[in-house]
Curated annotation (Swiss-Prot):
The 26S proteasome consists of a 20S proteasome core and two 19S regulatory subunits. The 20S proteasome core is composed of 28 subunits that are arranged in four stacked rings, resulting in a barrel-shaped structure. The two end rings are each formed by seven alpha subunits, and the two central rings are each formed by seven beta subunits. The catalytic chamber with the active sites is on the inside of the barrel. One of its GO terms (biological process) is proteasome-mediated ubiquitin-dependent protein catabolic process. It is found in: Cytoplasm; Nucleus. This is Proteasome subunit alpha type-3. It comes from the Eukaryota. Gene3D superfamilies: Glutamine Phosphoribosylpyrophosphate, subunit 1, domain 1 (3.60.20.10). It comes from Dictyostelium discoideum. The proteasome is a multicatalytic proteinase complex which is characterized by its ability to cleave peptides with Arg, Phe, Tyr, Leu, and Glu adjacent to the leaving group at neutral or slightly basic pH. The proteasome has an ATP-dependent proteolytic activity.
């Protein structure tokens, strides 16, 4: 970053001579240093998977979750700072509740994503605030079918068939590009998400991690859920076996 230290990174509202907002770049760096997030929009729903890094063996299993419910038909996954992400999760739940109270129906996924994106963007306009150091994958099923959107610190909001964030973003993206999303079921996507996360995990730098999986599909009656233990264990076994086969 050519202008670091020259004053252009002191305020999020200040552009550098080459047209950058360095504090937004720094927020993106926080996302890049997070555990890998992978999301797949299948033909019958959406699957979220997160490589939750475990910095200490004293950490209780299931702590600091990165997959969360927003409404019955909406689930999200987080890459980046959890403290910042909690604010976005709270905001998303409030937006979903207010929309349903006003219009009498569940909020469309695209509308929710755009509202959170606008909230993020607001935090790039004023010197008295800073960008959120996290990106959020928003998924669900509405009247338009399965939906997957990524909302980034800059306030961008983009729909995807498959998406990745975090340390293994590029390697995961390369794997996602090989998938025919329109032919894949959620059960198959759970295995693929697990396989990709295990394949991009860096065992040298990050030895321990927990695999978090969430899904919403016709099989769950269009309700977002944490993947059941039986399916989770089956997917993890498949991922580990695939990794062993690849290393042979």
């Amino acid at each position: 970053m050519s202008s670091v230290g020259s004053g252009y990174d002191l305020y999020v509202s200040t552009y550098s001579p080459d047209g950058k907002l360095f504090q937004v770049d720094y927020a993106n760096k926080a996302v890049e240093n997070s555990g890998t997030l992978v999301a797949i929009k299948a033909k019958d729903g959406v699957v979220l998977g997160v490589e939750k890094l475990v910095p200490s063996k004293m950490l209780c299993s299931g702590s600091n979750r990165r997959v969360h419910h927003i409404d019955t038909h909406v689930g999200v996954a987080i890459a980046g700072f959890l403290a910042d992400a909690r604010q976005l999760i709270t905001r998303a739940r409030s937006e979903a509740k207010n929309y349903k109270s006003t219009y009498g129906q569940p909020i469309p996924i695209k509308v929710l994503s755009q509202r959170i994106a606008s909230y993020n963007h607001m935090h790039t306009l004023y010197g008295s605030v800073r960008p959120f150091g996290c990106s959020i994958a928003i998924t669900g099923i509405d009247q338009y079918g399965p939906q997957l959107f990524l909302v980034e610190p800059s306030g961008s909001c983009v729909g995807y068939f498959g998406a990745s964030l975090g340390k293994g973003k590029q390697a995961a993206k390369n794997e996602l590009e090989k998938i025919k999303f329109s032919e894949m079921t959620c059960r198959e996507a759970i295995k693929e998400v697990s396989r990709i996360i295990y394949s991009v995990h860096d065992e040298v730098k990050d030895k321990d991690f927990e695999l978090e999986l969430g899904w919403i599909s016709t099989e769950t009656n269009n309700v977002h859920q944490i993947v059941p233990k039986e399916l989770h264990d089956e997917a993890e076994a498949y991922a580990k076996q695939s990794l062993e086969d690849a290393n042979m």
